[in-house]
Amino acid sequence: MLIKQGDRLINTRNWSELVKPDQISRASESADTMYGKFVCEPLERGYGTTIGNAMRRVLLASLQGAAFVAVKISGVQHEFTTIPGVLEDVTDIVLNLKQVRLAMDTEEPQHLELHVNKSGEVKAGDIKCNQHVMVLNADQHLMTLTEDVELTFELEVRMGKGYVPADMHEGLSDEIGLIALDASFSPVRKVAYTVEQARVGQMTNYDKLILEVWTDGSISPEDAIAYSAKIIKDQISVFINFDERISEQENEGRSSASDVNENLFKGIDELELSVRATNCLKSANISLVGELVQKSEGEMLKTKNFGRKSLDEIRRVLGEMSLDFGMKVDGFEKKYQEWLKRKQQNEA
C-alpha cells in the first residue's frame, strides 16, 4: 500500500508483507530460574542469524547488574601481599570476591562488611548485607583461615553494565589500602543461539531462532531478553524517517472478515482428520479452525491423549489450507460473527 506523507510516498509493503513471529515460546520449562530456552518463529530467511547475533551481544554487554568495585582489608595496604593466618594471598581473595554475584534494588552505591575471627572456611554468605543488597551465590568460597585471626573487609557495591576494569571506576577514594576491583556487572552469564528451518504453510525456507540464556539469578531469562529487545528497538528506531502513526491509522479498520482466510471459519468436523485427532480437539473445546491455529504446538501436546502423530496429521491438513499452529488472528470471534452473518444473508 502506498501512503502519502507530505510530498513523499511510503510503501508499507516493504514491511507489511514480511513474515513476522507471532510470539516467543519458552521451549524448556524448569524450576531453574537462571536458564531459559526460547523459540521465535517464523522469521524471514536470514533474520534468525541477524536477530540472534544482535540479541546475544546486547544480552552480554548492555544489561544492568551489581558487583563489588572496591575492597579494604584491615591491616592490608595493597593486593600483592599475604595475610598471616589466611591460606590464600590477597590476590586470590580478590579473585574470589569477583565471583560473588549480587542483586541490588537501588542505584546508589552500597557499603557492606565482612568480619571474621575464627579459623575455617569463609564464604560469600558470611558477608553482612543490608536491605538493598543480596548475595546470590552464598556458597562461593572466599578464603580459608588456618587460625583464629580477626579481619574486617569493607566492600563497595555499585550498579553498572558490561565489564569495567579496576582503573576505570569513577569516584573511588584514593586512600591507602583501598583495592579497586575489575567488575563484571552483566547479570547474563552465557548466551547461545541456533537457527533452524521453519515452516509456513507449504514453505519451509523460513528461519526458527532458538535462543538460550543463562543468568546469575538477579534477573529472569524472560526479562533479560525483553530488556535486550527494548534496547535494540530504541537504538534503531532513530533510522525511521517517516511518521509510523499515520501508516497505522491509514490501515486501521481495513481488515474485515472478507480479508481473512475463510478456512479459519471451518468447523473441526469439516476437516479430514482421524477420529482420534477430532475427539482430542473436541475434548480441548476447540470447534473451529480459527481457534485451533491460535494454539502453539506445545499447548496442543499438553492436551490429554494428544500425541506427536495427531500433531503431524493436523499440521499437514492446516498446511493444505496455508495455515499453521501459532498464528495470531486478531478479533477472531468478531470476524467469525461477521462472516456468519454475511453467509446467512447470502443464503436468504
Curated annotation (Swiss-Prot):
Its EC number is 2.7.7.6. Belongs to the RNA polymerase alpha chain family. Residues 260-348 are annotated as: Alpha C-terminal domain (alpha-CTD). CDD domains: RNAP_alpha_NTD. Residues 1-243 are annotated as: Alpha N-terminal domain (alpha-NTD). InterPro entries: DNA-dir_RNA_pol_insert, DNA-dir_RNA_pol_RpoA/D/Rpb3, DNA-dir_RpoA, RBP11-like, RNAP_asu_C, RNApol_insert_sf. GO terms for cellular component: cytoplasm; DNA-directed RNA polymerase complex. Pfam families: RNA_pol_A_bac, RNA_pol_A_CTD, RNA_pol_L. GO terms for biological process: DNA-templated transcription. The N-terminal domain is essential for RNAP assembly and basal transcription, whereas the C-terminal domain is involved in interaction with transcriptional regulators and with upstream promoter elements. The lineage of its organism: Bacteria, Pseudomonadati, Thermodesulfobacteriota, Desulfovibrionia, Desulfovibrionales. This is DNA-directed RNA polymerase subunit alpha. Homodimer. The RNAP catalytic core consists of 2 alpha, 1 beta, 1 beta' and 1 omega subunit. When a sigma factor is associated with the core the holoenzyme is formed, which can initiate transcription. It catalyses: RNA(n) + a ribonucleoside 5'-triphosphate = RNA(n+1) + diphosphate. DNA-dependent RNA polymerase catalyzes the transcription of DNA into RNA using the four ribonucleoside triphosphates as substrates.
